[in-house]
Curated annotation (Swiss-Prot):
This is Apoptosis inducing factor BLCAP. It is a multi-pass membrane protein. Coiled coil: none annotated. GO terms for cellular component: cytoplasm; membrane; nucleus. The keyword S-adenosyl-L-methionine does not apply. It is found in: Cytoplasm; Nucleus; Membrane. It comes from the Eukaryota. It holds the Pfam family BC10. SMART domains: BC10 (SM01396). The keyword rRNA processing does not apply. It comes from Carassius auratus. Its main location: cytoplasm. Acts as a tumor suppressor; induces growth arrest at G(1)/S checkpoint and apoptosis via RB1-dependent and p53/TP53- and NF-kappa-B-independent mechanisms. Modulates expression of genes involved in the regulation of proliferation, cell cycle and apoptosis. The gene is blcap. The chain crosses the membrane at residues 19-39, 43-63.
Length: 87
C-alpha cells in the first residue's frame, strides 16, 4: 500500500471554480496519473483501490471528479460572485 501515498492526494486537489479551466485541469490530472502509472508501476491492489475511489467519487457526482462535470450539480455560489476577479 506504499503506492497509495502518491495517488490518494490526487483525489483531494480541488477543481477550479472557473469552468474555462476545467478542461486544462482534467488534462493535467489525466497526464499526471498516466505518467505516474507508467513510471512507478503501482501494485495491482493499489491501482484497484485508487480506481474504485475515483469511480465512486465520479459516479456520485460529489463535485470533485476531474474527469467531467456533472450537469445535475450546480456551480458553487462563489463562482457567480462578481467580487471575485478571475485571471
Amino acid at each position: 500500500m506504499y503506492c497509495l501515498q502518491w495517488l490518494l492526494p490526487v483525489l483531494l486537489i480541488p477543481k477550479p471554480l472557473n469552468p474555462a479551466l476545467w478542461f486544462n485541469h482534467s488534462m493535467f490530472m489525466g497526464f499526471y496519473l498516466l505518467s505516474f502509472l507508467l513510471e512507478r508501476k503501482p501494485c495491482t491492489i493499489c491501482a484497484l483501490v485508487f480506481l474504485a475511489a475515483l469511480f465512486l467519487i465520479c459516479y456520485s457526482c460529489w463535485g470533485n471528479c476531474f474527469l467531467y462535470h456533472c450537469h445535475d450539480s450546480p456551480l458553487p455560489d462563489s463562482a457567480h460572485d462578481p467580487n471575485i476577479v478571475g485571471t
